[in-house]
């Protein structure tokens, strides 16, 4: 499996999960054979303001190659500037979180709120791809709610903007983490991009 110019040993990718995928957990998953490790999501604004707690989230151990760093935000300029600022860190992929359902993230137009704004998705991804040399990926959801199922549309937009890969959580923002995942929407996205 390849993402941009990065060839993975296997297709087993650790999903980025806030409060879970910290450094010790990632190392454990690497020992168990994960082909790609993903860090906890990091706020682009927190990076901009040099938040002290964010520095801990940026820790990367040499044994956890390859690793994906995930940013969240809604301002293309801030995301691109901060990605450029940290590009020298030893991560191989930069992922944009477009799936977080948590209210404090969504109310700022970040995370899964981006599923409701295709134009902004294009702006964020295209500006980020121009700003850094590392592959850019996105994590999306099935849609924001049952009335807005648009994973295929958002995946196509991300691809058009230059994303190297798209990960799909087969639930809507409204579902959070409960209910059954929609494997068919994941298949549809895979066939579309």
Regions found by a protein language model. Name each.
Residues 1-193:
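Flavin-dependent oxidoreductase catalytic cores
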């Amino acid at each position: 499996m390849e993402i941009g110019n990065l060839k993975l040993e296997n297709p087993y990718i650790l999903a980025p999960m806030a409060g879970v995928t910290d450094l010790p957990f990632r190392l454990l998953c690497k020992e168990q054979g994960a082909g790609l490790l993903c860090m906890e999501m990091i706020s682009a604004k927190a990076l901009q303001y040099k938040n002290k707690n964010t520095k801990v989230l940026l820790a990367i151990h040499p044994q956890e190659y390859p690793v994906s760093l995930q940013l969240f935000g809604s301002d293309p300029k801030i995301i691109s500037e901060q990605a450029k600022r940290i590009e020298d860190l030893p991560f191989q992929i930069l992922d944009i979180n477009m799936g977080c359902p948590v209210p404090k993230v969504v109310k700022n137009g970040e995370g899964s709120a981006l599923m409701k704004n295709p134009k902004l998705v294009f702006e964020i991804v295209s500006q980020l791809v121009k700003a850094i040399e590392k592959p850019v990926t996105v994590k999306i959801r099935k849609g924001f709610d049952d009335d807005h199922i648009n994973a295929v549309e958002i995946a196509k937009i991300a691809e058009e903007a230059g994303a190297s890969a798209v990960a799909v959580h087969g639930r809507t923002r409204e579902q959070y983490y409960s209910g059954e995942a929609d494997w068919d929407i994941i298949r549809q996205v895979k066939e579309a991009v």
